[in-house]
């Protein structure tokens, strides 16, 4: 019996040693694996990056020159990679964001079927399980995540479970070539729908089952496809330590699968539901942690870029009760599928500041598109009217200065949002609304912490008396300070329907973010503003435009001016340096030139002109 026991002990020891060896070998594959520093949540501020367009940290992985790698041709690979992102992490951290959303990481098809663009963006998936070699190796991706985590920056993966690249001919049920198909096991035609492209976006069957722009639509009703999608992305999330995911084309994915998918991955997800209907979008929060707030995006952009009424924003926010948690909505003013904000806003930096202030103080999680802080303008000519913009709005990052006014403005907004938790999880309550002025409160009803935002979107100063909400803890006589310029202060006074109110005169195109704290002194950095004032009564119904040399002015199309009185039109430019000279000429309705020679302007000055037409 003793001998038998000894043999048994020896056998068990050998099994344990073998098992430990196997586990050691398996874990050595991911010896550099990163781990999550915490799940994405409403406390975060997101910075969205197209990896290929950020920074080229390794020229050896750029691909074949003249094929997919074509510097300057924005439908093709430009060279950005994970090494480049890693090198610029301090720049991103210093901006004040807390999470980085990177473009899809899986290996993409080199070129589209017709060769008109490369898979630089990450949405032409070829091999879900392998990293795209243009971005780097898996170990380089893991190193990027680890370095981000060291800086307390979360990483959000962009995932693409809806489709692969366009391998199947329209409505075909088999591949036409063994050489042109996705990597196994996704090269099984039974895993796909075969209906052709979506033609009618009001037809929900088409939205869910047809192809998105020719990209092969995966059938998540197929159990094997469903299981493999969950497994491959679970591996990515686990191996690199991702903290959340953004689900591409979530509108076209079965909702039950979205819920199952998020559960399998084990991290919060937010989906792209590309439509402005709150009733439609809100349903997705029953299946995912969050969702991109396209309804608010469309209306906020109209308000801040095109000067429409604040009632359009109010009408969206009034429907917040339809969402499971409106603080989990991801808010934005532009992205890789829309024109850049400055492109639509006639390059008006102050409009940009107001739009950014809005998404940083309204409910939801703000998302800043890369390059916004560097005043990227997306070519300056709107293109989304012709479809999904995918060139100039995805330009290569122009630089990494931390001294620009917009960079510093976003930095300040990040500081404010990070300090005041009510801006992250507080209840949103409207205080005042009219066409050109909007005011709202964000209040933590447990602690009483409150921030009041007032935005004047008019071209004139506005004087208003605004009632304090009944829910507020603010008392008569309490001092409020503007966190965007602490020299601006006011007091809560008696009166109004709630017995407490604030009275203020707020300058044109200005936002106040008010706290009852006593914050450290802060004023916005000095701005170099070039102001052109055209003195002319253009008549009822007519508008004044400017054409000229030196962006944002061009000779091909005009910039619309603001009418500040019967015969005075104004246009402000912040892109010119002090002393920089340029030419310009006013036009009525952008089709009738003023008489005489071009006017000469100088950066940093106010130029008054009195044209004849």
Region roles according to the model:
Residues 163, 231-332, 347-349, 357-361, ...:
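Active-site-proximal helices and loops of the catalytic beta/alpha 8
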Residues 45, 493-526:
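C-terminal beta-strand-rich structural cap/linker in extracellular carbohydrate-active enzymes
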Residues 49, 92, 102, 128, ...:
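Conserved, mostly hydrophobic/aromatic
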Residues 54-63, 341-342, 540-542, 553-555:
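Short, solvent-exposed loop/turn elements at domain surfaces
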Residues 533-581, 589-607:
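Aromatic-rich carbohydrate-binding modules that target alpha-glucans
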Residues 507-511, 604, 612:
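Tight coil/turn sites that cap or link beta-strands
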Residues 7-29:
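Sec-dependent N-terminal signal peptides of Gram-positive bacterial secreted proteins and lipoproteins
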Residues 33-45, 50-240, 255-281, 302-303:
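Substrate-binding/active-site clefts of carbohydrate-active enzymes
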């Amino acid at each position: 019996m003793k001998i038998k026991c000894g043999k048994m002990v020896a056998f068990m020891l050998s099994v344990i040693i073998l098992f430990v060896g196997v586990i050691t070998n398996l874990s050595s594959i991911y010896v550099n694996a990163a781990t999550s520093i915490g799940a994405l949540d409403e406390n975060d501020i997101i910075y969205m990056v197209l990896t290929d367009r950020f920074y080229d940290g390794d020229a050896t992985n750029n691909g074949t020159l003249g094929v997919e790698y074509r510097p300057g041709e924005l439908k093709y690979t430009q060279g950005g990679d994970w090494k480049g992102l890693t090198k610029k992490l301090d720049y991103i951290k210093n901006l004040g964001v807390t999470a980085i959303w990177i473009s899809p990481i899986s290996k993409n098809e080199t070129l589209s079927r017709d060769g008109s663009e490369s898979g630089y963006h990450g949405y032409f998936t070829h091999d879900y399980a392998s990293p795209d070699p243009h971005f780097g190796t898996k170990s380089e991706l893991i190193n990027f995540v680890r370095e981000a985590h060291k800086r307390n920056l979360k990483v959000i993966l962009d995932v693409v479970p809806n489709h692969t690249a366009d391998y199947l001919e329209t409505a075909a049920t088999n591949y036409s070539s063994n050489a042109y198909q996705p990597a196994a096991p996704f090269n099984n035609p039974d895993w796909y729908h075969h209906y052709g492209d979506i033609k009618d976006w009001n037809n929900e069957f088409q939205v869910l089952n047809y192809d998105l722009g020719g990209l092969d639509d995966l059938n998540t009703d197929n159990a094997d496809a469903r299981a493999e999608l969950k497994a491959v992305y679970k591996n990515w999330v686990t191996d690199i330590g991702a903290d959340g995911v953004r689900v591409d084309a979530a509108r076209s994915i079965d909702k039950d699968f979205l819920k199952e998918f998020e559960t399998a991955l084990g991290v919060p997800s937010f989906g792209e539901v590309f439509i402005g209907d709150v009733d439609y979008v809100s349903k997705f929060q029953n299946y995912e942690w969050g969702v991109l707030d396209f309804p608010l995006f469309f209306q906020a952009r109209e308000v801040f870029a095109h000067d429409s009424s604040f009632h359009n924003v109010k009408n969206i926010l009034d429907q917040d009760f339809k969402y499971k948690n409106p603080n989990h909505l991801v808010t934005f003013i532009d992205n890789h599928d829309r024109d850049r904000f400055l492109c639509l806003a006639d390059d008006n930096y102050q409009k940009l500041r107001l739009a950014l202030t809005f998404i940083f103080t309204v409910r939801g999680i703000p998302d800043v598109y890369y390059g916004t802080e560097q005043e990227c303008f997306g070519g300056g000519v709107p293109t989304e009217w012709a479809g999904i913009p995918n060139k100039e709005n995805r330009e290569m990052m122009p630089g990494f200065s931390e001294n620009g006014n917009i960079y510093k403005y976003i930095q300040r907004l990040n500081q404010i949002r990070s300090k005041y938790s009510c801006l992250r999880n507080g209840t949103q309550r409207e205080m005042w609304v009219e066409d050109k002025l909007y005011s709202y409160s964000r209040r933590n009803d447990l602690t009483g912490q409150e921030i009041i935002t007032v935005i004047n979107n008019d071209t004139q100063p506005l004087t208003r008396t605004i009632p304090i909400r009944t829910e507020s803890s603010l008392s008569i006589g309490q001092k409020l300070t503007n966190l965007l310029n602490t020299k601006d202060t006011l007091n809560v006074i008696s009166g109004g329907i709630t017995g407490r109110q604030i009275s203020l005169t707020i300058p044109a195109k200005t936002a106040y973010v008010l706290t009852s704290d006593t914050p450290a002194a802060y004023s916005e950095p000095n701005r170099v503003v070039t102001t052109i004032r055209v003195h002319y009564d253009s008549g009822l119904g007519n508008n004044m435009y400017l054409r000229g040399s030196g962006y944002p002015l061009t000779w091909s199309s005009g910039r619309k001016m603001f009418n500040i009185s019967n015969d005075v039109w104004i246009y402000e430019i912040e892109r010119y340096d002090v002393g920089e000279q340029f030419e310009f000429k006013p036009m009525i309705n952008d089709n009738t030139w003023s008489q005489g020679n071009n006017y000469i302007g100088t950066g940093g000055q106010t130029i008054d002109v009195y044209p004849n037409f």
